């Protein structure tokens, strides 16, 4: 490993795309794992620096693979989103996790990977120290895993505002009333905050599908109530 160079990493990523036809999202997952491994090599003195730093960014630059910049919701859009979720009988059970993500800025894997021990209700803080990921291997099957944040800045303590605190308390009460408990252990981690009715962790794909349906139905409701072609706020 001591003979590896930055060019070796770039060549490896290019080979994954050109010869194995992997998508950039898959290469991104591989980069996450590889970066952590090389970090360990640096700590043990086999390498002076992490030669995979910025390798994925450079790959995207050379192949023009940067996706369109995502825009944050405006305040009116946020208010519409929260109000619709809180009042919708069909989607109300999604309110706690989306409210938490909106009020903290946590990514999907950070939110779905939260454990109750990461929540400090006394000091109103949330510890973000790991990411829940989902691996899909043709030979090994599909399974969840736990990764460390991609950078040291990713490991952080987030203040818990009142709306997030209320959402978490609502989630705890909803699970108590429904008799739902966390019945899964992922890489030694358990007691996850957000679990489905089977006691398993939430899948990112499930959240994405739910979000698309929420946006569709919310916008349809707004348009149905609109009068005289007046401008309305819609979810993007």
Spans of model-derived segments:
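Short regulatory "switch" loops immediately downstream of catalytic or recognition motifs
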Residues: 15-17, 58-60, 83-86, 129-138, ...
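N-terminal core-binding DNA-recognition domain of tyrosine site-specific recombinases/integrases
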Residues: 1-44, 89-92, 201-207, 228-236
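Basic, Lys/Arg- and aromatic-enriched nucleic-acid-binding interface segment
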Residues: 24, 28-32, 43, 47-49, ...
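Hydrophobic face of alpha-helices
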Residues: 31-35, 48, 112, 161, ...
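Short, contiguous acidic/charged loop-to-helix segments that flank catalytic cores in large enzymes
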Residues: 69-70, 86-89, 145-155, 195-204, ...
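Active-site/catalytic core of tyrosine-dependent DNA strand-transfer enzymes
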Residues: 74-79, 161-232
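Conserved tyrosine-mediated DNA breakage-rejoining catalytic core shared by Y-recombinases
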Residues: 54-58, 77, 113-177, 182-189
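Arg/Lys-rich amphipathic alpha helix in sigma70-family domain 2
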Residues: 39-48, 170-173
């Amino acid at each position: 490993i001591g003979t590896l160079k930055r060019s070796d990493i770039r060549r490896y990523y290019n080979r994954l795309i050109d010869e194995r036809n992997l998508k950039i999202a898959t290469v991104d997952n591989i980069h996450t794992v590889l970066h952590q491994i090389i970090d360990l090599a640096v700590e043990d003195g086999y390498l002076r620096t992490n030669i995979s730093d910025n390798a994925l960014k450079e790959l995207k630059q050379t192949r023009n693979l940067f996706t369109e910049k995502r825009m944050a919701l405006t305040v009116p859009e946020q208010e519409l989103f929260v109000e619709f979720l809180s009042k919708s009988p069909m989607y109300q059970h999604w309110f706690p996790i989306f409210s938490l993500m909106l009020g903290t800025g946590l990514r999907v894997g950070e939110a779905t990977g939260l454990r109750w021990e990461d929540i400090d209700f006394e000091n109103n803080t949330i510890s973000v120290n790991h990411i829940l990921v989902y691996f899909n291997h043709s030979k090994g099957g599909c399974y969840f895993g736990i990764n460390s944040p991609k950078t040291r800045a990713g490991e952080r303590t987030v203040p818990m505002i009142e709306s997030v605190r209320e959402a978490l308390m609502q989630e705890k009460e909803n699970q108590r009333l429904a008799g739902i408990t966390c019945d899964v252990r992922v890489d030694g981690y358990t007691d996850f905050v957000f679990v489905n009715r089977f006691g398993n962790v939430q899948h990112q794909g499930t959240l994405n599908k739910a979000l698309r349906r929420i946006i569709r139905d919310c916008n349809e409701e707004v348009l149905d109530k609109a009068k005289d072609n007046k401008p309305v706020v819609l979810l993007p």
